Amino acid sequence: GSTDNGVGIIQQHFHDNRIRIFHQENQGVSVARNRGVEEARCEYVALLDGDDEWHPDYLKIMTKHIQNNPRCGLFLCAFIAQGASRSIYCIPKGFENYQGEINLFHNVSLFGQTSGTVLKKSVFNRTHRYIPHMIYHEDYLLIQAVALIAPVFYCGIPLNKYRGDVPGQTTQNPNTPQAEESKLMYYNIGMEDSLRVSEKGNESLNIYLRYFLFHDFKRRLSLKDNEALLRFI
């Protein structure tokens, strides 16, 4: 779905047999990521969105954590959110410089950001993978599914930069019908994932999802959009 001639730039300036380009019809970010993980030759897959940046030592540092924590199926790191007017360090309180295992469900959205995610392929393949046609929260839904079946490692050092407010970003308008539908899918599939773990589900994830549901309902009320509320109900 890229419109910035990224493939042409890569082909012109980089000649490395480790770089492989796969062409497919634009079916959304979830299908593209699933294809990328499927084609990956290694056991660990580091994700990077086109608008974002890694610190020069990101892969080196994350590789060290992988080597020291082989039982983990997901590796995350803190990030900097850069908007048009300011930058914000996104690190959960008390986790600055922390390096170790975490309970992801204490704060999924602040712990997890796509370009600071390294997946263990064998664990990824045991989940439902990224859900096609979701344009919002598909990344949170995936890392939740992984965290339900494998330990999660977190590095509280901001090693990647998330760029928001970029023209043409799929997530620029959170109030479209497709975006609203994606958020409902996030909640419903998230609860299904939780209940697969046990009869009552994962308690921490259940609490987080109820918190998400409450605030999403308040947001829809504030919009005074009856259609959005009906979709929610």
Role assignments for model-derived ranges:
Residues 95-181:
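Conserved nucleotide-sugar donor-binding catalytic segment
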Residues 48-50, 76:
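Active-site acidic Asp-centered loop
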Residues 45:
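Short aromatic/hydrophobic "clamp" motif used to bind/position activated sugar donors
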Residues 57-89:
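Conserved donor NDP-sugar-binding/catalytic core segment of glycosyltransferases
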Residues 24-40:
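Glycine-rich, basic loop-to-helix element that forms the pyrophosphate-binding segment
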Residues 141, 148, 163-233:
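C-terminal subregions of glycosyltransferases and related glycan-biosynthesis enzymes
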Residues 52-53, 134:
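Acidic metal-phosphate-binding loop of nucleotide-sugar-dependent transferases
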Residues 1-8, 49:
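A conserved acidic beta->alpha catalytic loop
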